[in-house]
Structure formats: structure tokens, C-alpha cells
Amino acid sequence: MEQPVIKEGTLALIDTFAYLFRSYYMSAKNKPLTNDKGFPTGLLTGLVGMVKKFYKDRKNMPFIVFALESQTKTKRAEKLGEYKQNRKDAPKEMLLQIPIALEWLQKMGFTCVEVGGFEADDVIASLATLSPYKTRIYSKDKDFNQLLSDKIALFDGKTEFLAKDCVEKYGILPSQFTDYQGIVGDSSDNYKGVKGIGSKNAKELLQRLGSLEKIYENLDLAKNLLSPKMYQALIQDKGSAFLSKELATLERGCIKEFDFLSCAFPSENPLLKIKDELKEYGFISTLRDLENSPFIVENVPILNSTPILDNTPALDNAPKKSRMIVLESAEPLSMFLEKLENPNARVFMRLVLDKDKKILALAFLLQDQGYFLPLEEALFSPFSLEFLQNAFSQMLQHACIIGHDLKPLLSFLKAKYQVPLENIRIQDTQILAFLKNPEKVGFDEVLKEYLKEDLIPHEKIKDFKTKSKAEKSELLSMELNALKRLCEYFEKGGLEEDLLTLARDIETPFVKVLMGMEFQGFKIDAPYFKRLEQEFKNELNVLERQILDLIGVDFNLNSPKQLGEVLYDKLGLPKNKSHSTDEKNLLKILDKHPSIPLILEYRELNKLFNTYTTPLLRLKDKDDKIHTTFIQTGTATGRLSSHSPNLQNIPVRSPKGLLIRKGFIASSKEYCLLGVDYSQIELRLLAHFSQDKDLMEAFLKGRDIHLETSKALFGEDLAKEKRSIAKSINFGLVYGMGSKKLSETLSIPLSEAKSYIEAYFKRFPSIKDYLNGMREEILKTSKAFTLLGRYRVFDFTGVNDYVKGNYLREGVNAIFQGSASDLLKLGMLKVSERFKNNPSVRLLLQVHDELIFEIEEKNAPELQQEIQRILNDEVYPLRVPLETSAFIAKRWNELKG
């Protein structure tokens, strides 16, 4: 079939499942995405995002094909039974979405191609070979290197990989790539190649001898290029090498002919064709974007389409550049420092990182002049360490430093150059963005949302590190000017005045508190953790053997799929709808088989082992301290989060979890730990906001609030017996809990839960009036406000009653959780200010409503009393008193009475 020649645009070949799987696992890093009905949507979200991106770039891909995997056994799997068998089983949550995703692709009008017995890679190879057009393969699979030519390129979504790039990266031609794979193997596909020969020696062999066949034809020459051990492996693994090459070789003839005109990119937005499905699965924001779109392209030839511009923003947001000076001598840097004598100087600054977060440089902008300081080279020449220490100190002393996520930059300057941070002036646009909408804080997404600019930050550019200084400078110039415009946007009306004040008085000073905690670190008992690591490992082995013996078959205990098959199919235990083996479902069949309690015990221990015991030993510094990273803008409610490691999620209620906490200790014998915990902070906020007389009186007189509630609901005689129910109701209300959730929490009938809540509101009508009023206010304003005026935004446009109910519950929760966060921040600021430059008190950690300090043991009672006084009396004038409990100990696990 004769094909037309297209002079512009390309044929896009999509490695469909690879794209979707990657987006699914990215979305599942923190918490898997689900819709309001609990159905998993991470993979579908990736599909929708992919289609949005492709539609935006449709003029560059007039023809598009989605390549699919064969549903039958592939040729490679027939050749090698172990082929890809080392890969983990796909999560059931993901598998549920695949048929839906394929159906959506078909409905949207895309061409999907599957060939029985062949992988999607083979489909792509065949179509790329047949194609008369320039062809772009959308994938990160390195096997496609063998196809690269002047007509075929590989694209990972950001960077194009050409034939010359294959030569540069691997030192071989694309035509030699299967030979290369034959030698080095591929661990992801589970074929081994030649054991012990890596990329360096494989490259030398192929550069010298040309192909795998030539290598084995000229073993005497190959012998001179290898160590004796490698040469012996080459001889022994000949069969493996040729099998590996065969497996790596993509089939270019599984499709003999193809009508490329039939795979034109759909002329209208493909998502319009699945509006009903998007609604069904809860893609509300996508539907809203479709409805609010100022234009819909219909029946427009893609190759001749003209870009349609958005409305011009209020600010002048056209991308601007500044002249950049690469600082390679002391003179221009000294001249820059002289300009800082202006007391109103503002320096816009970006920490320059590579994709692995390694620091490469600093870029900064003063007025309209940009500067690029390569730090890797600058450490040696022409700048001395002392010169840079002085330069950075002057910079932070004289100018207001403005950045987006400044804490890593400031921490770097303090750690590397000992720059004092006590009296610095800063403005962080990430904090301003967080106050405007806590759901969107990333630099690129904030620029897109508020300035309507598409800018890829340098750290997301794959080859940024290898670019020339001139290229880096130009990219950073764009970033710095975008940062400047973003700051102007927030300061000139983009953010309410009271939130700017909140940023200045609370959130910005809080950055310094967090840096102090991070630098201080929390010491661990390293020998204890080494012993615990071995104990956990031994116990895991024993548990695993016990479980397998009880079940009577060997299988991978860490595979939910295999566990489900064993429990539900082999043992015939009662099944749930999804065959899930999560904790909730295993608890339902706890008494059905003696292995179930052991499986739950194994899982808890395995999580502790992999999350804490081993990682903590790896992450400790030379002083055996753990330095976590606190995220100020990571949660919608304003609560702190931490990572690397997450010290806020160390279990407290289980004996094994307490063993982890036991390993955290005071840094020396002169110090001890102090834990100060706010008592019932959300309920005190409920009393403050609702002004309920009975609730306020109970707190003012120091009564047991849960017992008082129980008396009001059940009478004096049953009060103690029913206290736990009253406690669940008290806390449930501030978390937006309804009768259904209460019935699940207490394991009681729904009707009984409803009667408890009705009785509660009848007894405390002012609380009911307050909560109803808050819901009405959230519906009216689409915002839920905290004590200090932060807010969370909810968009009720076009949502159904179910979603609206969820939003209102989240809104009520945001008021109390967010206000509790406000109080904790105020308390941490007050204590930090009181003990500034005083080594007798060091703030280490915040966990929920608790603060962990390290204090001098000789003055421990007095210091405890002073810290509690500040936290109780100086934080905020609520209508009821704030109250804390405190404990002193040498180890973290002992901080509860």
C-alpha cells in the first residue's frame, strides 16, 4: 500500500501499558487514588492526563497508534519460561482499571493495535519499520535503542533520544544494541546474558569485534580484552548470550501492512467522547475543564491548525529573560555584593539541582541582572571557601531572599558554608501558594495555575546537567523571572492581605524553626537497632516457616495475589468481592484458619523491619543522629509531614512499634527527652467555636470531658461503662464522622449509631447549630477557615450529593485539624523564641499534637514547667484553657505515663 509523505508532524507510537503503569505507580507512591465510591482510579487518572497532554501536542503527532500487549502467551515466554517472571504481581487495584482504560481508548477514537503472541514492543518495531513518516516512540524502554535511525526517535515525555545519543550513552551503534543486551542481559526482563561482564567490557568487545557472532568467532581476540574470569564466563554462557540476544531482538515483521491514514489523531478533544464515563468514575475537575474550555476544536485539519491563546492574564506574564553573568571570577561577584547596600534589595534565588537532587549551582536575580554560580567548580577555583562564606553571609544579611521552597536552599548554605540564618529576611512563594490553595504548591503547577505559563523547571529536564553553561544560564534566567512575576502576583492582589500577614508573621518564621529541628536531629541507639534488626529478621523467618507449614504449600508470602489464591482458592476461606488480603479483610476471617493471626503479625513486623530498623541504620550520621525533612506545605490541613525517614508514623500502640521508639534516645548523658502533649485540642476548639455552655464549663472546671458527655447521654449509672462511646462521638464530630462511620468504629448497628448522634445533638443543640452553620458557610463560600484564617478550597460546581457530602465532611475536619495545626505552630514559635540560642532546650520533633524536646537533665523540672506554661498560656486566647501533659525520659518509648 502506497503511503503519503508527510512533511511536518510525526507518527506517534505509544507503549501503552508502560505509560499507564508508570503513571499508576507514581500516583500510588503516597496513597493510591480512588474515587468517592472507593474504586481505584490511579491508572485511569494517568490515562486522562496522557490524553490531555497528547491533545495539547496534537499538531506534532498527526498520526497516533497505541500498541497493546498480547493477551496470549508471547513468543519470548515460550522460548524462556522465566522471561519477566521476576516482576512483582500487578496490584489488583491496577488490574481492575486496565479493561476500562482500553475501552476508553477505543471510545475516544484512537487506533489500538494488538498482535497475538507478540509484545507491544514488537508491534511498535513493526509499525516503525513500515512507517514512511518520521516516527516517535513514546517509551522509556531501552530495548527500542535498536530501532533508532534518522527516521525513528525515542521520546520519554520530555527528552528525545536519537541514534547519536545511543552512541554517546552506550558507546555502540543502535544496530549493535541487541548484541550488547546479549552480553549484559536485562534484569527487568529476567535474562542474564554473560554473567560478570558489564557494560564497560561489553562496549569494548563490540567496538573491537562488531557483533556477538564475531566475538565468538574471534575468541582469541576477545580473550585479550577480558580478565580470565570474564573470559571463562564468556565461554560458559555462550548459550545464554545468544538466547539473551534473541529475546532482546524486537520482531519487525509481525505486521506486514498497515493503513496509516486510519490512525489520524481525533479532530476533537477525545475526552469529550467519554464524558459519561468520566462522570461515572468521579473525574469532576476534568469534566469542569471540558465544560469551561473556551474552545473546542472540531473538524480542523491538525497539520494546519493555529494555536488558540488563552486570555491575557492581569500581569504581564510573557516569558522574559535577563542577561546572565556566569560567575567564574571574584570581580563580578564582588560587584554584585556592592549592589546589596540598598536596604530594599530583593534577590530572587533558585537552588540548581540535577534529577538526583544533587546540588550543581546557585542562580539569582537582582533587579534585572541574573547570575549563575557553578558551585561544583566554585569550591576549588577561583573562589575559596572563606570567600563564598563571606559572600553568602552578606547576601543573606543585606537582602530579602525570595524563592520557591527556600528551606533546602537555606539549609544547604548553613550546612556547607556556615551562613548564619538568625536574622535573615525571606519570602517563599511556595508558602504563599500553599495559603492560596494547599492542593497546588509545585513551582511549575503554580506558574500554570496563576500566571498561565508552561515552564519545565530545570530539575525536571533530563539532560540539564550536561548542557553548556550558556544553555543552563538561559533556562535559569527564565525560571528566575517567572519566580519574580509569581511573587509580584501574590503581593499585588493574588493573595488576600490577611494571608500575606499570616505568611509574614507565622508561616515564614516557622521555616527557621523547622530548619533548627532538622539540623538538631534525633539520636538513635545504633547498637540497639543492630540487635533489633537481627531479632526482627530471625522472627520473620520463624513466622514465615510457621505460616507456610500451617497452610501446607510454599508460596511468596509478600505477594497479595499468591496469598489470595492460597487463602480463598486452596483453603476455601470466605471470600470478599475483590479477593483482597488487606488487614481489614483478614480481620474478618481471623478465626477461620490458624495462619491468619500469624500473617497479620508477619506483615506488621515486616513493615517495621523494612521501614525503620534497616533504613534508620543507613540514614544515621556520624553522631548516630537521624535528620528527617519536615514538609510545611505537604498536607491540605496544614499539619506537618516528614520524610527520609518519616518519624511521625512510627507506631505507638503496638509492642513491636514501641521497640522502634525505644531506640530513639537523648544525645548525651547530660540531656533527657521531654514529651509535651496537648490534651483534647480539637474538642477545646469545638468548645471555643461553638461556645456551648456545658462543653465550655467542663473544660473550665477541668472535668473529664468524655465522662461528662457520657453522663449527659446515658446517665450517671452507665456513664463509666459508656465513656468509650462518648469519646468516639466527641472526636468523630470534629472529624466530620457520620452515623455510618460511627457504627463501623464501635461495631454497632447503624440504627444505634444514629440514635447516639441524635441524642448527642439533642443534649448539645448549640454544637449542632454550629456544625450546621459551618456546613452552610462552606457551601456558600466554598472555603473552610481555620482559627488563624487559613482556608481549604472546595469546588461544589456540578458535584453530586455524595461528593458534596464528602466535601462538607472534609471541610469540617479541615476547620479543626487546621486550627490544631495553627496552635501547634504558634506554640513551637513561642518556645523557640523563648529558648533562642539557649542549648538547654532543643526542639526535636512534632508528632500530631505532641512536641518532643531534648532538655538539660539537671534543670529538667524547671524547664518542663516553663515549656508547659508557654504552651498552655501564651499560644492563643481560646474561650477555654489549653492544657498539656508532660513526661521526662531517656528513651522515646518511655514518654507516656
Curated annotation (Swiss-Prot):
Which cysteines pair up through disulfides? They are none
Q: Which Pfam families match?
A: 5_3_exonuc, 5_3_exonuc_N, DNA_pol_A
Q: Name one GO molecular function term.
A: 5'-3' exonuclease activity
Q: Which CDD domains match?
A: DNA_pol_A_pol_I_C (cd08637), H3TH_53EXO (cd09898), PIN_53EXO (cd09859)
State the residue spans of region: Polymerase. Answer: 498-896
Q: How does it assemble?
A: Single-chain monomer with multiple functions.
The record's section on SMART domains has: 35EXOc, 53EXOc, HhH2, POLAc
Q: Which InterPro entries match?
A: 3'-5'_exonuclease_dom, 5-3_exonucl_a-hlix_arch_N, 5-3_exonuclease, 5-3_exonuclease_C_sf, DNA-dir_DNA_pol_A_CS, DNA-dir_DNA_pol_A_palm_dom, DNA/RNA_pol_sf, DNA_polI_H3TH
Give the organism, scientific name. Answer: Helicobacter pylori (strain J99 / ATCC 700824)
Q: Which NCBIfam families match?
A: pola, PRK05755.1
Record's catalysed reaction(s) = DNA(n) + a 2'-deoxyribonucleoside 5'-triphosphate = DNA(n+1) + diphosphate
Report the protein name in the record: DNA polymerase I
Report domain 3'-5' exonuclease positions: 318-494
**Family of the protein in this entry:** Belongs to the DNA polymerase type-A family.
Q: Does the keyword tRNA-binding apply?
A: no
Q: What is its EC number?
A: 2.7.7.7
> What is this protein's function per UniProt?
In addition to polymerase activity, this DNA polymerase exhibits 3'-5' and 5'-3' exonuclease activity.
What keywords are assigned to this protein? DNA damage, DNA repair, DNA replication, DNA-binding, DNA-directed DNA polymerase, Exonuclease, Hydrolase, Nuclease, Nucleotidyltransferase, Transferase
Q: Biological process (GO) annotations? A: DNA-templated DNA replication; double-strand break repair
Boundaries of every 5'-3' exonuclease domain copy: 1-317
Broad enzyme group:
transferase
